[in-house]
Amino acid sequence: MHLEVLDTYSVAIEPGTVEAHIGHTPLLRLRFLDNELSAGVQIFAKAEHLNPGGSVKDRAALSMILEGERSGRLKPGMTIIDATSGNTGIAYAMIGASRGYPVKVCLPKNASLPRKRILSSYGVEIVETDPMLLTDGAQLVAREIFASDPEKYFYPDQYNNDANWLAHYETTAPEIWEQTDGRITHFVTGLGTSGTFVGVVRRLRELNPKLEAFAVQPESPMHGLEGLKHMATAAVPGIYDQSLVTSTLEVATEDALLMTSKLAREEGLLVGPSSGANVFAAWKLAASLREPAVVVTVLCDGGERYLGETFR
């Protein structure tokens, strides 16, 4: 089934730039889990780690930057400032370099070292924040920096910016619909800013009101899954819409890391721990289904950002 993929970005993007290659990622069949599923149940993963900046956050970062330019809030000479667990910051850095904007990010001190090195390689100014407060603490610091000089900074505020989820409403969801020929029955992904979940589910529910949507989160507040929120104990993003959730699937850090390793060694996919959490949750859900189903999840980022931590 063909569905036109909305491309609101095209008018603002020069062909041949790095931004022009964000999105249109492949949808991969995860066959190594087939023998544990009922006949007709399939698991697919959207390979967002293959975006130019290496993560699903490329889409939202581009959308927020373009919206900033369109609205006049982002002007030449301004610096982009935001809180991040790492991936959105890397996406800001890549796109900022391409479009001529300096970038400053606030991220927890315990963010993975490879992510920090990538940010530094782009010339990003890093402000490390209290690791015990996770990204909630980073948001507080980012707001303080922005408030100190609002004429200098563009603050996308990814946790509360509708351009975040609209990126997935306009691009990711139509891609999934077309790549599954409209057969998707279940969508499973983790919650960080919640932009991917909210945008994809809102659009796909317009196309298939019976779509079941599962939100993945760590099973405890103290976890090792960078980028994912334990919603019961974290600051809930302003863009999050609980009404879209069919059910919540909780994943232990250990299970996510084991699945991350299996993805590399049995499927040839070197991805990060949040991807492992998504696939583990999708597998547990799929294994419970007795009727034919198409379960789609997301590979959020590449495993290169976790070498020496997840992979030893």
Regions found by a protein language model. Name each.
Residues 1-312:
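PLP-dependent amino-acid enzyme catalytic core
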